[in-house]
């Protein structure tokens, strides 16, 4: 089964073609990602209207490129998978309407995919990970620990009660005068800094709840920067290093609790199979090497296999959307042409956080 994937949920326009064999491995035939970073950099963050217009301008061209790179014609595509949420509604509309048009024109089925499920299943695509496993999803819009029991069966253990980790990186970078996107800028600056110079909090550390919180850390960074202003390059490096150290300590503490919860449901003594259970990280922030090293250390200590997909598949991409769509189609599912994009779409809609949900419900 050959699928075309389309991803337009935020500030990357992405298309891909994969070859999927039910019960076997999947092969990525093409994977195209067009970043809008230059469009949004002057504003220090993603501007939804600019993002939607950029998707409109480039998506058709990228669909054709994905087909060309995969040496595939549109008539040879068996199904179309598209991100239907969560994300920026304008961008989602662009992708969903294009997928519907292709479905109508070709008569091929189309499936609306949860963007978070794409991230959740990426390790199955890249490493053939077996269920169940623990997922840490860290991106600009989400910070969650998820127990992945199987396709369509997700248990959200913890989520952020305020800022997502990627958002905290971007806001901290902007505060320090570093360029957008903030994650790589903070990581680069931190390499030259003293992580012990600036005392910063570790939000929720020691608490039994499994949620995350980063707004207090961001506030502490602002206060520290104000106290020593004007900032020199050395000051910026030290604050960046101290911030990153606080983040990795917090991630270690929160994920440690999630691993304990995992082993309560799935005792390691009863685990069967040639490989230990997996701790998987996904999302754009998973590119941070300090976070990866922290998670690798934690996994080794707790008897888990640590899996981080290639960097190109950690950030938003359409190959993961096509793969998630293939999993759903293999279960006999497909979407009707009257479905509407969802700006909020929790992976586990039965597991909403008690704090920080807002009037519109959980952010996902």
UniProtKB/Swiss-Prot annotation:
Region Disordered, annotated ranges? 341-364
Q: Name one GO molecular function term.
A: N(6)-L-threonylcarbamoyladenine synthase activity
List, alphabetically, the Gene3D superfamilies matched.
3.30.420.40
Pfam families hit by this protein: TsaD
InterPro entries from the UniProt entry: ATPase_NBD, Gcp-like_dom, KAE1/TsaD, TsaD
- What chemistry does it catalyse, as a reaction equation? L-threonylcarbamoyladenylate + adenosine(37) in tRNA = N(6)-L-threonylcarbamoyladenosine(37) in tRNA + AMP + H(+)
The cofactors named for this UniProt entry are: Fe(2+)
Q: What class of enzyme is it?
A: transferase
Supply one GO CC term from the record.
Answer: cytoplasm
Details of cofactor binding: Binds 1 Fe(2+) ion per subunit.
Q: Which family does it belong to?
A: Belongs to the KAE1 / TsaD family.
Name this protein carries in UniProt? tRNA N6-adenosine threonylcarbamoyltransferase
Which gene holds the coding sequence for this protein?
A: tsaD
